Structures are given as C-alpha cells and as structure tokens.
Amino acid sequence: MSSVEIRKVTDKKSLAAFIDFHYDLYKGSPYDAPNLYSDEVHTLSKDKNAAFEFCEAEYFMAYKDGKLVGRIAGIINKRANEKWERKSVRFGWVDFIDDIEVSRALFQAVEDWGRQKGMTEIVGPLGFTDMDPEGMLIEGFEELGTMATIYNYPYYPQHIEQLGGWEKDNDYLEFKLIVPQGGVPEKYQKIAEMVMKRYNLHPMHPKRSQVFGEEQIGRKVLNVVNKSFGHLYGYSQMTEAQIDEYLKMYFPMLDMNLICLIEDWNTPNHDIIGVGISITSMTRALQKCRRGRLWPFGWWHCIRALKFRKAECVDMMLVGILPEYQQKGANALLFYDLIPWYQKYGFKWGETNVEMETNNQVQSQWKYLDHQQHKRRRCSKKVIGDGC
C-alpha cells in the first residue's frame, strides 16, 4: 500500500494546486457550486484577507503515488476562541478522494499543527469567520448547492465516523421554500401591516449610491449583521477592515430590488434595524466557469444569471434583525416586501442559508410558506490535547 505524503502550501504555485483540487474532484457534479478561483485566492492569501488580523492558518495537501489526492486548511481564529473561551483549531477547505488513509493523514496534519499551537480541540468544517461556508453536508446530497454553502460527497461524513473520536458540535438546517403565487400570503400581510402601524417599522430598498455613498448604508447593514449574529455558534464580529472587504467583494453584484432593509421611523435618522439579502442562484453559472475562472467565458454566464435572471431559484443569503426588535414581527416585513419581487422575477423557489437546528425562532418564520427541510450539515469536534 502506498503511503500518503503531506505537503504544506508554501507559495503561489502550491496555493493554486490547493485551490484547483476542488474543481478536479467535483468536475461534472450537478450539485456543487464551485467558488470563483479569484475569490479563493483572496480568502486564502495572508496579504489579502482581513481576517488574518486575528487568524492564523496553514494549508496542507495530501499526495499518493505522486498525485494530489486531498487538501485541508487549519485555521485558528483567536477572536472567536477568546469570545467562546475555547482553544479550537478549525479545519476547512477539506476535500479528499474516497481513501481513509488520505483523510486520516489530512486531519492528523491539522491536529498536530493545532496541538503545537496550544489548541485542545479540532472543530469544523469552519472558515476564518462566520461569513465563510461552514458545516459538512450529511443530508441532501442530491440537492442543488448554493454559493454560500459547502457541497461534499456522501463519503466525507462516513470517513469522520470511521476515523473515530469525533462528536457532533453543531448542526445546521436548510430549507427549500416555494414562492407563493397570487400575492403575499395573508398571514404575512396582516402581521406586516400590524408591525408598520404599531411599531412604525417600514421596509425600504436602498439605491446603489446610498450603499457606497455618504449615507454608508452598506456599512450600516453589516453592522446590523454583527449585532444580530453575535450570539450564534462560533461567530466573531467583523472588523472595520473586514466590512470594507465584504462591501467591495459582494455588494457590487447585488440587485437592490432583492435587498430589503427595515427602518425604525421612531428614530430621527430612520435607523436600520433589519436586513434581508437575496440573490439569483448562481450555482449553474458557477458550474459553467471552467475551474472557477471568469475568463474566457465564465464572466458571461455570471452576468447572464445576475442581469437576465434566468434561474428559477433565489438564494436567501442573509436575514438579520437586531435583538431588541426580534419579538416585534419585523421579519414579516422582509417577506411582505420581498415575495412580490420574487414573483416578478419569476423565481419558483428559494434556498435558505444555514440555520442552527436549535434556532426555532428563525425556523418558525417559514411556517406560512410551503417549505421543506431538505439539507442538514454538521460541525464536528474532537479532543486533541490538554493545551499543555
């Protein structure tokens, strides 16, 4: 039996090989939503990703008979560890062929590195921050993936179980929501009208000039995300540098009609207290980008999806309400406002982002829609030492 050789990523060439392995392993998959190569380079580069202000990382590749057969990232998020009082080394960007010796060697590499850094547990899949994809798919392998989540083959969780020592740390659920026809469901409409009248909360759509201009609405939106997501599993607040980074990377591609903000008109400046961001599903377009590249023709597939709205699915990327408003029905305003836009754009169904299985408050907001819980993903953990 051939042995598995572990090599570290040390330069641009080896980083390119690390990134490209996913495209090779998932070539032809009808479910995977591959990331753009340029985005992966940005996220994984220490001189580009603002998360390296408080993170450190090491990337490992597995070779067998001279062939690349797996990859994994080891990440230590110091802010998250301090906040949650844990000594965790995260694993992410994990891919491997169906060979238990390969997966064993990859996880062992991160465990050893984490132990050297004084960590006591390994946990994942997680990224640098909560804005990166997280959780290993354990249900829903024949469902279409989204650009905000990880797709993996069914043998991945089987390897975790076979390797031993791992246990569940957190599960996420995802839902498929059928876009209703013939207007907004009556229940959403009644709640929304009550919320507007009783609490003076109102939906609005920002103009692109407001997002990036003097009003800095984009920054205000991400500040709402920081405050509303702060209690969630593994979350570490975005720094100002990260906010700048996300504004530049993601907001230019968003359709303002699919961004709904909730304002409190009781405040002098109509403060933003809630946000709902959706985007046309990019999965089919990303699958047509050869090895994640926009050139020569990948850009056309992405533009076509974004501008001509050829997809039947809308990805509901983010819903956040400030904690002090979460009991006032403010989330109903988001769907009261966005559902007519979904109908106008011809969307047939929506894909939610990941939701913690214990977050009953979030899951309850789908009860007035025809919905199906169709995916589950898991973060697992394993003790690797006592930190001494």
Question: Which sequence ranges carry the predicted segments?
Answer:
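Acyl-donor binding region in acyl/amide transferases
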Residues: 82-165, 290-369
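Catalytic cores of nucleotide-enabled group-transfer and carboxylate-activating enzymes in metabolic
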Residues: 12-14, 36-46, 53-62, 69, ...
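Flexible loop/turn segments at secondary-structure boundaries
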Residues: 15, 68, 78-81, 130-132, ...
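Generic start-of-chain signal for non-secretory N-termini
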Residues: 1-31
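Alpha-helical subdomain
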Residues: 48, 75-79, 319, 364-367, ...
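Acyltransferase donor/substrate-recognition loop-hinge adjacent to the catalytic core
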Residues: 3-4, 150-232
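A conserved beta-strand-loop-helix scaffold within acyl/acetyltransferase catalytic domains
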Residues: 22-60, 64, 72-82, 205-208, ...
